[in-house]
Every structure is written in C-alpha cells, then in structure tokens.
Amino acid sequence: MGPVMLDVASYELDAEDREVLEHPLVGGVILFTRNFHDVAQLRELVRQIRAASHERLVVSVDQEGGRVQRFRDGFTRLPAAQAFAALNSVSEAQRLAEEGGWLMAAEMIAMDIDISFAPVLDIGHQSAAIGERSFHEQPEMALAVAQSFIRGMHSAGMKVTGKHFPGHGAVSADSHKETPRDPRPLAEIRAHDMLIFKALIQSQQLDAIMPAHVIYTEADPHPASGSSYWLKTVLREELGFDGIIFSDDLSMEGAAVMGSYPERAQAALQAGCDMILVCNHREGAISVLDNLSPVKAEQLTRLYHQGSFSRRELLDSPRWKLANQALTSLSERWQAHKNGEK
C-alpha cells in the first residue's frame, strides 16, 4: 500500500480512475459531494473502488456535520460541532456528541467507508475555514465534548482523525484559498490551541492527526503540514504521538508555498506525514504518482473500519432511531439559532 490518497471523478469509476487506483503508490480514496447521488449508487461506487485495486484501499470522506457533510439525502442531517455545547447543558452536550460520533461513523461504516476525517479540534469560531466546525472557544469545553464524540466514533468501529494540528482556530484566513500565517507566540499556541491535542494524545484517543496548512511564523517558515518541527519534534517526540499523520489536501492554496505537486508531496512525507491527500486536481495527482519515490505505508492498514453491520441492520436498531431523531432535532435548532442571529 502506498501513501497517496486521491479522489475519483464522478458517480462511478471511469477508465482513468481505474488505472490510477491500480498504481502502487495509491493507498486511499477520498469521496466528495460530486461522488454522491443516492445510497445505492454510493454503495456501488465503493464496491468498484474496492475491486479496482489489489490492495484494500482506505476509503474516506469529510462527514463532520453542519456545513461539511458530503452525503445528505438518505443520511442523518448532522448538527455542526458548535451546536452541541452552544444549545445544551454540558452533560446533554456530551451525551448528544457521543451519539453524534457514533451515528456519523455507523452510517459511513454501513457503506463500507473506513474513515470520516473527524473531529475538528480547532479552538474558536473566528476562522473562516473553521467557524461552526469547532466544538467551543474554550479549550476545556472543546475537550469535554470532543472526548464524547470520539467515544461514539470508536464504539461504532471507526478510527478517529483529529484536525488541524497544532490549531487553525486563531487565523481568520482560509487555507483553502491562501496560506494563513499565525504570528502568535509559541507559548500561547501551546497553552491554548495545542492543549486539546496533548490531552487526547496522552489518553490515547487519537488514531490519526491532520496538520494545518498554516505557517506559525514564530516556530517555522513552513506550513505545519510540511514542517518537521511540528510533525517530528513536537508531535512525535514531545507529545509522543504514534498514530497516522495525514497531510491536508496538497491542492489547497495553503500548500502552494511548498512548490510543485511532487515537491509538495515529497516535502510532506519528509516532514513526517504518513499519507498525503492530493484532491480535485487530477493532473497534479498524476504528477505526484509519476515522480514520487516508491514508498510503502503498511501502517495505514490500521485505519480500516471495524464494523460488520449492514445499513438495514443499522436503520432498524433502536439506538439509530433515537440518535437520528435527537441529532436531526439539534440540527434544526442550530439552523433556527443561526437564522435568528441574522
């Protein structure tokens, strides 16, 4: 299995998709809204992806809830992370977050999807890229809710990816469109943004981490996703993280400062990433596959889902019915809350 995760064009695989997925450097596929028409089509697409490679690829999606939910029709409308604590008592926020993590993961596993890149562990709501995707503006409260969400994901059989290390919440710029710079002192980043990552690593609750395409100017001239300081010195050595490190999508503008697509890929791997995402730019992905040195990434097999239930079994279960009702209600309350603020 190789270290490259990429995307496919549409609702079903075309000839180029199949050829790309057979490449020995490919280890995973990430799905987007453009890959989803309905539940039956999605199930068939995942089957095609499984059949296209000699390896069992890691199939992934961003199904966080709120504004980042790639699959909607036929799936529970999940509330934004901010909604849990914003509209409920602490104990109720934790209860609903655990059900949210479980239900999100279970609905994906029932489609034979291994991971949803969640949860977002960034602190605060001021960043354009993060906003309602963050659990809370206070690190301690964000941690309390995140722990419950993670417990739910794990109970369904899905591995957890915390993002975006060491914290994207304090920069207003959107790394999808530019390379944000965070000028704060390192001591502040460590005491505020990194607190949640440190706590979850110490309690061994994170299976994977995705770093930010943000330059922390007091630490390093490179974005964290291409920084050996952040990934090796801090994450591996100082915090003792031994899970999988993903790059965020190397086609985002935040990664452009790292050079051409092959240069970005090489920089991310050399900095300490185990798997690199190259999405929404097929030409860039192919140039990475053509130019990257052979790399084996067998540790990525740890990311496979552990569920063995069917979608019908899930939808018939009392837990799903109760969770679906509670989370749909919270999602509607959150939408009404936001509309009332405008």
Swiss-Prot record:
Q: What keywords are assigned to this protein?
A: Cell cycle, Cell division, Cell shape, Cell wall biogenesis/degradation, Cytoplasm, Glycosidase, Hydrolase, Peptidoglycan synthesis
Q: In which pathway does it act?
A: Cell wall biogenesis; peptidoglycan recycling
Q: What is this protein called?
A: Beta-hexosaminidase
**What does the record give as the reaction this protein catalyses?**
Hydrolysis of terminal non-reducing N-acetyl-D-hexosamine residues in N-acetyl-beta-D-hexosaminides
Record the organism.
Pectobacterium atrosepticum (strain SCRI 1043 / ATCC BAA-672)
Any Pfam family the entry gives: Glyco_hydro_3
What functional role does this protein have? Plays a role in peptidoglycan recycling by cleaving the terminal beta-1,4-linked N-acetylglucosamine (GlcNAc) from peptide-linked peptidoglycan fragments, giving rise to free GlcNAc, anhydro-N-acetylmuramic acid and anhydro-N-acetylmuramic acid-linked peptides.
What is any one of the record's Gene Ontology cellular component terms? cytoplasm
Gene for this chain: nagZ
Residues that coordinate or bind substrate? D62, R70, R133, K163, H164
